[in-house]
A protein has these predicted regions:
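Positively charged n-region of N-terminal signal peptides that target proteins for export
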Residues: 1-4
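N-terminal leader/targeting and pre-domain segments
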Residues: 7-9, 13-45, 129-132, 136-155
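Thiol-based oxidoreductase modules, predominantly thioredoxin-like and allied folds used
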Residues: 26-33, 53-56, 73-92
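Typically the conserved alpha-helix immediately C-terminal to a functionally engaged Cys/Sec
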Residues: 35, 60-76
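Short active-site neighborhood of thiol/selenol oxidoreductases, capturing the structured segment around
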Residues: 45-59
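Structural alpha/beta surface segment adjacent to cysteine/selenocysteine redox centers
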Residues: 94-102
Length: 156
C-alpha cells in the first residue's frame, strides 16, 4: 500500500502548494498544501510528516492555527513537516484516495523515513490529544505507539 503512495507522488505536481506562514514568530514551521512537496521536505529533513486531510466543510476542518495555540505545541510542531490537504480539490481528492480515508477530517503521522504510517485517526483531536500525538511521534520513530482511547491518570 505504501509503495503505491510513493509511486503516486511522481504524478502529483511538486511545484504547487508551499505556503510559508507569514507571521511574526520565526519559529513556526512551514505549512505545505501539496503532499508531494511536503513528502520530499520531510524526507530531506529526516522529520516525521504530519498529514491533515480536511473536508470541504470548513466548520469541521482542522485549523492549524488552533493546533499551534500553545507554546508547547509550537515547539513540538517544529519537529514535523506539516501538510494540510483540502480534499475538495483535485489534488486533495488524489491524496485522500492514497490514504483510502472516508472519514474526514483525518490526521496521520508518517515516520521520518517516509516508509510507515505511525498514527492515524479521524477522531476530533482536542488540546491534550494534540499534545500526546506530537509528543509521542516527534522523533518519527517506528517504535512509537499511541492509543488516544486510553485516558492518562490524573493524580490529585
Amino acid at each position: 500500500m505504501f509503495y503505491h503512495l510513493i509511486l503516486m507522488l511522481a504524478v502529483l505536481d511538486p511545484s504547487v502548494g508551499i505556503q510559508t506562514q507569514q507571521v511574526a514568530a520565526a519559529n513556526q514551521p512551514t505549512h505545505f498544501t501539496n503532499y508531494a512537496a511536503a513528502y520530499r521536505e520531510a524526507q530531506q529533513a529526516k522529520k516525521p510528516l504530519l498529514v491533515i486531510l480536511n473536508p470541504a466543510d470548513e466548520s469541521s476542518a482542522v485549523k492549524v492555527e488552533e493546533v499551534r495555540n500553545t507554546q508547547q505545541r509550537r515547539d513540538l510542531l517544529q519537529k514535523f513537516v506539516v501538510v494540510v490537504i483540502d480534499t475538495s480539490t483535485d489534488h486533495g481528492e488524489t491524496v485522500n484516495k492514497l490514504f483510502n480515508e472516508k472519514s474526514l477530517p483525518h490526521v496521520s503521522v508518517i515516520d521520518r523515513d517516509q516508509q510507515w504510517q505511525l498514527f492515524r485517526t479521524s477522531k476530533k483531536l482536542q488540546g491534550e490529544d494534540w499534545n500526546r500525538v506530537l509528543e509521542t511521534f516527534q522523533n518519527g520513530e517506528q517504535t512509537a505507539r499511541l492509543n488516544l482511547d486510553v485516558k492518562l491518570p490524573c493524580f490529585t
